[in-house]
């Protein structure tokens, strides 16, 4: 369907319309710019016997893992996030993990669903990006039409049960003046990662080469810009790789669950 390739038309979709399009396979890959104003979420799905430990892990690491919804065991719905929402079909890209290894990427995980699986929806930076755009701040990955670059750092998350590993951050290049404004704007959204965790000096958090992100795509950094880093909801994928649960499902980086909630609901000021 042609309208789904047009950025302006993609932005005009409601959250429900976006989910239905993903369910039909009409939207694949990055959901950046999709359903303007609607909250998007990272996804982590784990067996019930690991759910309590993962919830504790998220509570101990609220910057990279801000939980905005949890399903009941075996339930493919998270009612507080949307009507007619199906965790197993409504994401534009999934990753399947076994014993810490990503073994498959697919567009539907309905045939893998089990009665013991619990889904966690985790706040996504696309919510604060909308506020940045409204304030006139540039988003280089959007300008370039690529996924935001994401990096594994040497900053450890606080462990819980079997879950431990490094924080993942997303990066957006900004001038120093823009970075100050970005801190002010994103601080209003603590439920979707909030303010940056690091500015400049990528090597200080273990990032050796900005041109080689661990997830997403590289972007240009101009001579008058600094890299600004936010905690990222891809962190659970790094933790799953380190913790090696027997089975897990996540979203593919950049491919989010679009909800019926509005970004404005998550602003604190």
UniProtKB/Swiss-Prot annotation:
Domain of life: Bacteria
Disulfide bond residue pairs: none
EC number: 4.2.1.-
Keywords: Lyase
InterPro entries documented for this protein: D-Glu_cyclase, Putative_hydro-lyase, UPF0317
Single GO MF annotation: lyase activity
EC class: lyase
Gene3D superfamilies: PSTPO5379-like, PSTPO5379-like domain
Pfam families: D-Glu_cyclase
HAMAP family: Hydro_lyase (MF_01830)
Family membership: Belongs to the D-glutamate cyclase family.
UniProt-recorded name of the protein: Putative hydro-lyase M446_2125
């Amino acid at each position: 369907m042609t309208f789904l390739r047009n950025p302006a038309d993609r932005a005009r979709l409601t959250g429900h319309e976006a989910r239905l399009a993903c369910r039909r396979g009409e939207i694949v890959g990055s959901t950046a710019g999709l359903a303007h104003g609607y909250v998007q979420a990272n996804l982590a799905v784990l067996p019930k016997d690991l759910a309590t430990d993962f919830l504790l892990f998220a509570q101990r690491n609220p910057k990279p893992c801000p939980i905005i919804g949890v399903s009941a065991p075996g339930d493919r719905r998270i009612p507080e996030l949307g009507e007619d929402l199906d965790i197993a079909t409504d994401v534009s890209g999934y990753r399947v993990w076994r014993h810490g290894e990503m073994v498959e990427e697919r567009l539907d995980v309905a045939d893998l669903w089990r009665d013991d699986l619990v889904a966690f929806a985790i706040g996504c930076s696309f919510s604060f990006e909308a506020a940045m755009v409204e304030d006139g701040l540039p988003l280089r990955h959007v300008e370039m039409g690529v996924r935001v670059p994401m990096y594994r750092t040497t900053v450890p998350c606080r462990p819980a049960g079997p879950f431990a590993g490094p924080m993942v951050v997303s990066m957006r290049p900004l001038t120093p003046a823009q970075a100050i404004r970005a801190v002010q704007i994103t601080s209003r959204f603590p439920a979707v990662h909030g303010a940056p965790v690091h500015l400049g000096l990528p090597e200080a958090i273990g990032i050796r080469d900005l041109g080689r992100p661990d997830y997403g795509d590289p972007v240009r950094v101009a001579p008058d810009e600094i890299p600004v880093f936010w905690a990222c909801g891809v962190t659970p994928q790094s933790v799953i790789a380190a913790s090696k649960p027997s089975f897990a499902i996540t979203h593919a980086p950049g491919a989010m669950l679009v909800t019926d909630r509005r970004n404005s609901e998550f602003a604190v000021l």
